[in-house]
């Protein structure tokens, strides 16, 4: 089957839905694809299709993520929907880093809930630059004052985490009614699409920087070879170019023999795109999630670094007790978690939840890193901190 070439005529933007469980993230995702496919072409995705997100295994923990695509008048969007279970957080850390903007779904019937707060916080930590709010289930609230109250609460919460709460577009709608084809609610989906076009700037893509792709998944395609998938963090990779596989194991070189996106073949992959990369002569078992593909000589694996870390408070879902030197949590880099131990500054005995701290981390195996790389700290299945690499030591 020959694959058609991917159309690049519209700017390409990555977005996703975030918010509390059962507030309607998946229903909204389905409504967006359904309403926009009527106006601008493309494929409508049913709730069930999106809800049955393919399972992705990450170190024995199953994560589900659904990718859909749609067009607005001006742009092409790739949209990720994360199911709202307890492991959502892990998905935020690996997945929300893939968002140029997020649609925060808040049910007007409930207002902001604990996961609403947690997702905003994580959006801040993992670098989601813009948030738009879809106030869902407005068909079930007759009281205008109540809607205004919920809006105010959401704006305050966003402001609390350094998003411009006062200026963020809030669209009042009903995903379910839009999905059922009621025009007044369908128009709200169009309003949301217009807000995405207006409010989320076309990101300054890092296409001029050296190529780097964090590997999310690896599989072999019989007769063709090994394919790795992920979102290109920066640069451009052309078919035929040499790349290095960096991190976890010894660095190796290979050649890119194919690039594809949404099952369409490309001559090259560019920063910001979710792609599959076909590698020449590389065995499935030689490569794993958590490594990166990079332009040769541009990034090195390291195990020891200085970092600035924010430790989540108990209220934010963090630890209830302090930790001390020798603490050994997991450090999440891009798509992987690595155990590491910490050293605290000389005069500091312990770190309290809610503190900011400068710490030196030593990982048990090397990760491709440079200054400015962000990470999360996790233990026992929950996020307890977020940080950034300030200086590479070894």
From Swiss-Prot:
Residues 136-139 are annotated as: G4. It is an enzyme of class 3 (hydrolase). Residues 10-204 form the tr-type G domain. Residues 81-84 are annotated as: G3. Residues 19-26 are annotated as: G1. Keywords: Cytoplasm, Elongation factor, GTP-binding, Hydrolase, Magnesium, Metal-binding, Nucleotide-binding, Protein biosynthesis. GO terms for cellular component: cytosol. GO terms for molecular function: GTP binding; GTPase activity; guanosine tetraphosphate binding; translation elongation factor activity. Gene3D superfamilies: P-loop containing nucleotide triphosphate hydrolases, Translation factors. It is found in: Cytoplasm. The keyword Chloroplast does not apply. It catalyses: GTP + H2O = GDP + phosphate + H(+). Residues 60-64 are annotated as: G2. This is Elongation factor Tu. It comes from Buchnera aphidicola subsp. Cinara cedri (strain Cc). SUPFAM superfamilies: EF-Tu/eEF-1alpha/eIF2-gamma C-terminal domain, P-loop containing nucleoside triphosphate hydrolases, Translation proteins. Belongs to the TRAFAC class translation factor GTPase superfamily. Classic translation factor GTPase family. EF-Tu/EF-1A subfamily. GTP hydrolase that promotes the GTP-dependent binding of aminoacyl-tRNA to the A-site of ribosomes during protein biosynthesis. GTP binds at residues 19-26, 81-85, 136-139. Monomer. Residues 174-176 are annotated as: G5.
